[in-house]
């Protein structure tokens, strides 16, 4: 597809047609009907009204980066969301949001707007990190947590938090971590093991 971002396809029963769904961090979902030969038949939904509405607001953008893992060699995929009025000469509180569960993926160039946007509007920097054990990085990366679930992921999250806390625009005394389900377990583990970096 010509658009960079997250793509998925839903095929008709006969496989003569498919709907391509594409989005990226700056573009809401676009649904396009294609023939099996790859020729676009028509756009079903382009979310033009939503795009136009968003232009009325100052929306914080996701910045995709890589952060060193605890092993010192692996780079972890991450995104940062800074306040719209970000000033590099200031230091901001940081909240890391993560799930970190086996074969999951939270860092992707796909559309989504949730409460993290509100935090950025309120002067927080938000980071999302996929540690080792998560998906879309190959078999070795995904399976390295086998029989030691929670160890490598928490080590990576603590290392990433320390790296971020070392950036001049982060207030190293105000670094928090949050997650749900497996991410809640990870948050608790990181607070216990990494209490020298996490304050909440």
Where are the predicted features?
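Surface loop/turn motifs at the tips and blade-to-blade linkers of beta-strand repeat domains
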Residues: 2-3
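Serine-hydrolase catalytic core recognition
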Residues: 7-200
